[in-house]
Swiss-Prot record:
Could be a nuclease involved in processing of the 5'-end of pre-16S rRNA. One of its GO terms (molecular function) is nuclease activity. This is Putative pre-16S rRNA nuclease. InterPro entries: RNaseH-like_sf, YqgF, YqgF/RNaseH-like_dom, YqgF/RNaseH-like_dom_sf.
Length: 140
């Protein structure tokens, strides 16, 4: 196992959750969410995050249906990942993200009740869960 840093994204049409993680520890932490306008992020905000954290790899969550089929948002998330690669030249991996938002809400609620369930917090923790699940899958 290497010590690469990895940035995870929870794609959404209004907000994109972001987390940063380390392969060596297999852990991640949520960062601030990036606002999106109909799924289009402020690319300058993403550029700033990439320059600040210098990730070696990017992981984008794929919102699949429960039966594993794709939906419109899945196609848009894949397109977002492809654009990340095209704009910034970083390797992009995709990870099934079914139920991560539900898990993120439960985790935040346990910590702070309803007040902890701010949208940006949920998106960041969702990105954290996507990233940690990807690392677990890679290195078990």
């Amino acid at each position: 196992m290497s010590s690469r840093s990895i940035m995870g994204f929870d794609y959404g049409t209004k907000s994109i959750g972001v987390a940063i993680g380390q392969e060596l520890t297999g852990t991640a932490q949520p960062l601030r969410a990036i606002k999106a306008n109909d799924g289009i992020p402020n690319w300058d905000d993403i550029d700033k995050l990439l320059k600040e954290w210098q990730p070696d790899l990017l992981v984008v969550g794929l919102p699949l249906n429960m039966d594993g089929t794709e939906q419109e948002i899945t196609v848009r998330a894949r397109k977002f990942g492809n654009r990340l690669h095209g704009r910034f030249g970083k390797q992009v991996e995709f990870k099934d993200e079914r139920l991560t938002t539900t898990d993120a809400r439960a985790r935040l609620f346990e910590r702070g009740g309803y007040r902890a369930l701010e949208k940006g917090s949920v998106d960041g923790v969702s990105a954290q869960l996507i990233l940690e699940a990807w690392m677990e899958e890679q290195y078990g």
